[in-house]
Amino acid sequence: MRDLLPPATGVWNYVEDAARRVFRSYNYHEIRTPVLEETQLFARGVGEETDIVTKEMYTFEDRDGSSLTLRPEATASVIRAYIEHRLDQRPGVQKLYYIGPMFRRERPQKGRYRQFFQIGAEAIGSESPFLDAEVIEMVVELFRAIRLEGFKLLLNSVGCPECRKAFSAKLREELAKVAPSLCADCRRRAETNPLRVLDCKVPEDQPIIDALPSILDHLCEGCRTHFDAVQRYLTDRAIEFEIRPRLVRGLDYYTRTTFEVVHGALGAQNSVMGGGRYDGLAEALGSKIHSPGIGFSIGEDRLVMSLEESRKAEFTPELDVFIAPLGEPALRECAIVARELRRSGLAVEIAPEGRLKRAMELANKLAARFALIVGEDEIAS
């Protein structure tokens, strides 16, 4: 966990302001959910066997005996709010976005922190592959808006529960042959949730995983048609992507489309955004109404790092006007002038002391665009 201080926070504001503009252009509206949720929400939504639930959540018992957890991700919370507040009764697809802190007890590494920030969006109420393409387009537009270059979009389909069931059986059969050569986590996953083996990041396991069957060869007709349509709609938008059959993401709720954006500035763990479709999540959380959805989350810490390391933006704080008053009467007059300038949208600083040389040195250090010197003659005129 860490503090974020100026001028670094200028980068964060730049990214968040751009995200809000892009989301608004696609008719998304902000949702704010609690940082604390009942633990069972994430166990049911994210998946009992996922690393997030088994290893990474900050969970504690409240005074009344209930189990609470600092949210490790936001999608489950958004769907809970969607169900609880009957947002399915509102017209059209519900398009929601969020910006805020999440918490996971992860192993510290480059760009990953135990309190981290996510920017994300969820579109709930449609199974259309056109919506999948629109959501992915929105991500690409955001990255273009902040002038992030060198990113790559990865795409896959993990199928529906039916075709995934057949694939899991085949995968479990193949994993039984190679499991002794895999890491301890993969050996455990091979028994509990074989699809998760494909999400392994251990370098030594990759040649074995690459030789495993591909889920794209086991999609049912409906999932194949859906995935083909997503690719077609992305191509119509001139959005470049790369098919990655091993892209399953680390959460159990995903169905059909999964996608990820990677950036070379981050090294081996190079993901800055991940998302996918979750057509059964609402029902898993207790909804009696089928509410298919798709969404994504951007790791803001890692995105900011990518921006800074690619040197595509300078984020020094902008001071428009520095005012240097000479004497007490000028200081009092400058307070009124500064107020009017601030009301017009300018960033203004008034020198706290009356020494001109020191004031000009400070104006230079603050990189002010303009310096205004006010003395008795200026007041008189």
What role is predicted for each listed range?
Residues M1-S381:
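TRNA-recognition modules of translation machinery and tRNA-sensing kinases, especially anticodon-binding
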